[in-house]
Amino acid sequence: MDNNMKYYEAYEERYKTVHQKGISWASDKSTPIVMDIIRRYYIKPEYELLEIGCGEGRDSKAVLDEGYHLTATDISAEAISYSQKHMPEYAQHFRVLDCLSCDLDSSFDYIYAVAVLHMLVPEEDRNGFYHFIHDHLKSEGIALICTMGDGKTEIQSDISKAFELQERDHPFASALTSSVTIPMTSLLIHGFMTDASIG
């Protein structure tokens, strides 16, 4: 393990570990709200879409199968390689990206991130995530940030233990390590308008 790796890069090792066992990290069932938002806001196939934290591509596949122009990104090279191998017809749509330290030359009509924000623990990293989305979203664009939590309880992971692999018992080899509540005010502070009717 590289001592210079950031805590949120621990998923690289987790993906490698489960893939070496011939299993996937998550189920292949897509997150319904991703396509629900596309339909609700009349996002057209020719629009530019960005997925942050695509993992093994479960949501990417659903979007790409519908003919949308999607760039699917993840910080994990292992996850991107897995997605390209399992969806060779869409391989060119997947790329490695650390949205906290890299930039893209494009802007997007729809940016979505499912189960990403809870992995960014310090406030400065969450702020960097919001800034990346704000900087890459077209002026009339739509952003979907879908995270874990019950809306009341906030649990903060110990980032010093991010690289400690833990034995987990779960049906799809998919367990996420922390759960957070995102106050709407933090989205408003970063220049986002919110739609509280989604749910």
Where are each of the predicted segments found?
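A short glycine-rich, Lys/Arg-flanked "PGG" loop and its adjoining helix->strand segment in the class I
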Residues: 127-139
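Class I (Rossmann-like) S-adenosyl-L-methionine-dependent methyltransferase catalytic domain
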Residues: 1-45, 49-103, 142-199
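A conserved beta-strand element that flanks and buttresses the S-adenosyl-L-methionine
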Residues: 112
